[in-house]
């Protein structure tokens, strides 16, 4: 409802979404301008939210621009092509793309030497921003020139897991890792939230982005009673810029 109200008040706003929100937006008659896809896993597998990825793209609006990262699994890209999606490619930056001799070293002059075997053209723009598509969307929009971004649905938490879900674990057992609970609790502003390791990584990305001075005045957050909403409140409380309200009220 808040998103619909915002679009009504700002009819020229462009909605950029991630795959998990895409079907619900269409169901509620909100047609996204774009959907960012960053998924190196097969479309037949289950997503981080235990949804078969193919089901998320059961319906595709021909007007949606799908921004598909080059690291995306070919099965996802082929499914979108077969269903007539409008696709734009992009490269997501990770340190693993760099030449082996440069990996782990500080980047100089915002330029990196890539592994030539990857086939990424020299001078290509690489999108930074975080561990998931939602966070990369901020970097992508900023690269495109957008300077007024409103964040909806950034939560990074979930309802309390069921007894069955509480038995789920994560970890590469075959690789010698000790299995860990999939669902964990974290405390933000004296409030407990249920989350997962991947969602917690996104929350940490949010914390970094909210404190990035180059994004000052560009981001606006919409939402409450979520982990990220509390992180945004912390950001506002730490804000040190002078307030001239009293001056202008005189």
Predicted regions and their residues:
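Metal-ion/cofactor- or nucleotide/acyl-coenzyme-handling active-site neighborhoods
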Residues: 1-250
């Amino acid at each position: 409802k808040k998103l619909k109200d915002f679009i009504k008040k700002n009819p020229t706003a462009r909605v950029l979404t991630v795959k998990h929100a895409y079907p619900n937006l269409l169901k509620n008659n909100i047609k996204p301008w774009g959907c960012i896809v960053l998924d190196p896993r097969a479309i037949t597998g289950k997503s981080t939210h235990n949804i078969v990825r193919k089901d998320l793209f059961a319906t595709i609006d021909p007007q949606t621009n799908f921004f598909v990262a080059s690291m995306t699994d070919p099965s996802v890209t082929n499914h979108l092509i077969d269903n007539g999606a409008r696709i734009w490619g992009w490269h997501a930056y990770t340190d693993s793309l760099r030449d082996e001799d440069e990996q782990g070293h500080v980047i100089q002059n915002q330029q990196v030497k890539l592994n030539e075997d990857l086939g990424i053209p020299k001078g290509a723009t690489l999108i930074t921003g975080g561990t998931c598509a939602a966070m990369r969307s901020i970097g992508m929009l900023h690269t495109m020139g957008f300077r007024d971004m409103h964040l909806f649905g950034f939560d990074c938490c979930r309802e309390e897991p069921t007894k069955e879900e509480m038995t789920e674990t994560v970890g590469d057992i075959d690789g010698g890792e000790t299995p860990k609970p999939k669902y964990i609790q974290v405390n933000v502003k004296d409030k407990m939230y249920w989350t997962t390791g991947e969602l917690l990584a996104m929350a940490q990305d949010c914390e970094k982005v909210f404190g990035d001075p180059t994004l000052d005045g560009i981001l606006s957050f919409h939402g409450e009673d979520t982990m990220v909403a509390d992180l945004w409140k912390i950001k506002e409380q730490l804000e040190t810029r002078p307030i001239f309200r009293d001056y202008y009220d005189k």
